C-alpha cells in the first residue's frame, strides 16, 4: 500500500510523524509506515556507515613484511618484485588512510601506481590477485588490447571501473579503494623509431584515456556497461584512491636497455659492462627505456613503481607445482583423494611438465593444461575403477609415451 488515504484514514510516517500530505510518498508495511524522506535519510546513514567500515579496514593495512609473507605462501620466486609490490601497496593504503583521517592539506601524498614488466607466465596477474585477496579489497582485471579511445569500436576505459564496482557488489565506497590490474599494457605502446604501418593507431589515445582515471578523477560509469548515451543514468566513482597495477611483457625492451648502457658485441678493445642475460637487463629498466618503447611520458609519470619479473626457470616451475598452498600437485592429489586414490608425481615427471611449459613459452600459466592433458584419461576412468588405490605419473606419461602407472588393492 502506498500513496494517499486508505478508508479515509490519514496515514503518518512511523519514524518522523509527518502525514501523507507533507511528503511525496508513504510506503506501508505490516502496521508500519515510512515516508520517502526517511527512506532517503536511512540510505545516507547506511552509506556513511559503510564508508566508515571501509576506512576502518584500511587503518589495519598489513606491513610490507606481512604482505611479503602472504605472497611467499602463494608465489614462487620473483623476490625483488614481491618486495617492491609489498612496499608500494602498503604505502598506497597508508596514504589513503592518512588522507581520509586528516582535515588539513599540508602534505599531498601522490599515488603509488605500479608497472609490472615480465614475460608471459611469470606471475604478474597472480601477484596482483594475491595482494587484493590478502587485503580483502575488490579486484578487477582488464585487457588493454580490448580498450579503445572515443570514436573507435571497442570498450571504453570506464568499463574497467564497472568491473571493479561489480566486484564490490555495487558498493561504490568499497570499489573506490579497490585494485585494478590492466594487462597487456605494452600492446598499446606508441612505437618509436621505425614505426610499423600496422601499429594500433589508437594506442596513444587509449593511454590518454587511461591516464585520466589512473591519476584520479570522478568518472561517470554506465551501470550496464557499453557506450555512454545522453540522459543515461550513471554511477559516479572517484578513482583517486584506486590502486592501478598495469603489466606487460614488453618484448624487446632489453635491447633498448642495452643501447642505453652502451653494450656492444664483445670484441677487441671494448670495455663494456658484462651482464649475464636478459633477466639482468630487466632489472636495469628506467622510465627512459619505457618511453622509448612507446608509453607516453605522462602515462609513465603516473606509474612511479616499476617491478621487473624474471623468466621462470625449470626449477622455479617445479617449485610452483609443489610448494605453494595452492600448488597444482596438491590440488590434483586432493581431487583424486575424494575417490580414495593416492596420486604421486615422479621427480622426472615434474621436470618434464616444467620443460614442456618452457618449450611452449607459457610459463606458470601453462602448467595446469599440461597436467590436464596427462591426466584426462585417468580422471575419466578412476571413478569407475574401485580397485585402484594409487596413480603414479611418470616422465613417459607426461611425454605421451605411456600411460600413468596404476596400483590396485
Swiss-Prot record:
Residues 1-54 form the ClpX-type ZB domain. The keyword Ion transport does not apply. Zn(2+) binds at residues 13, 16, 35, 38. It comes from the Bacteria. Keywords: ATP-binding, Chaperone, Metal-binding, Nucleotide-binding, Zinc. The keyword Protein biosynthesis does not apply. ATP binds at residues 119-126. Belongs to the ClpX chaperone family. ATP-dependent specificity component of the Clp protease. It directs the protease to specific substrates. Can perform chaperone functions in the absence of ClpP. This is ATP-dependent Clp protease ATP-binding subunit ClpX. It comes from Streptococcus pyogenes serotype M49 (strain NZ131). The gene is clpX.
